[in-house]
Every structure is written in C-alpha cells, then in structure tokens.
C-alpha cells in the first residue's frame, strides 16, 4: 500500500509521503501511511476550514465534552491540512492529522515536557492516509484522485 501511495503521489506538488531512512537498521511495516502538506498548497474550501468543525464542544476522554466558543487551539494543524480532512470527508474518505504532541494534550498540560518544536512543526503539516488490510488498491487510487481534486 505504501508503495502504491508513493507511486501515485510522486508528481503531486506539495504532498510528501513519509518514507523510512535508507539506513538498513530501519524496516517499517508502514502500518500508518503518513504524509506532509506544504503550507503553500491551497485546498478547496480552505478559507472555511475551521468554520466547518463543531464549535459548541471539543471532545475529551470517555466522551466528556467542554463547551467552547472557538474551534481553534494553540496547537492545531494548518488550515490546508484541516481543509483537506474536511474535503476528503465529503468524498467519504476518512483521513486525519497526525497525533497532537503529547505535551499539548489537555491531560498532560501541567506535566514536564522537553521539547524542541519538531513535534509541533510536524503536527501542523502532517496527515494520515487511510491504510489497513481492508483498504484496496482501488481505494488508494480513489483516495489519491480525491487529494488531487482537492488541490487548487
């Protein structure tokens, strides 16, 4: 699946598929197919990216919700990554940002953290592509076509 994503995305400017280092000590099974989206890439609907999310509640652990008046936080994906997620959802494809850095998770807000900015940088531009045993080659082709369609 990773190789098919790699082949189909190779000419899509601004989308970079995560690859393992050329070092033989690494041997990824690519259970997660992740990519980054260049901040300069524009996505259809990007100007409304954070207007599309639910603004009345932000999910928490075990279904706990907290009323909010803003759909944004101090650490969130770039607008184009969120716009791509929303666009893909409209195409019945679920993709998501990469995981929010642990030190930015509410449960760890008061915990000590040793950071250098890398995790926040990756979170702003990273997204996960559908992957798994039930994602077919035809599914991957459809997913990539949707990504191409989303880019303005």
Regions found by a protein language model. Give the residues of each.
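PLP-dependent aminotransferase class I/II
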Residues: 1-152
């Amino acid at each position: 699946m990773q190789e098919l994503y790699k082949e189909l995305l190779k000419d899509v400017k601004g989308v970079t598929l995560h690859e393992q280092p050329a070092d033989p000590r690494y041997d990824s099974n690519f259970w997660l197919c992740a990519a980054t989206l260049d901040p300069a890439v524009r996505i259809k609907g990007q100007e409304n990216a954070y207007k599309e999310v639910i603004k009345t509640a932000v999910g928490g652990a075990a279904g706990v919700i907290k009323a909010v008046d803003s759909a944004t936080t101090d650490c969130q994906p770039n607008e184009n990554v969120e716009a791509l997620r929303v666009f893909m959802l409209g195409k019945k494809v679920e993709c998501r940002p990469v995981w929010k850095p642990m030190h930015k998770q509410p449960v760890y807000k008061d915990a000590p953290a040793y950071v250098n900015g890398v995790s926040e940088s990756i979170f702003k531009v990273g997204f996960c592509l559908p992957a798994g045993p039930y994602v077919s080659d035809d599914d991957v082709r459809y997913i990539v076509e949707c990504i191409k369609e989303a880019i303005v």
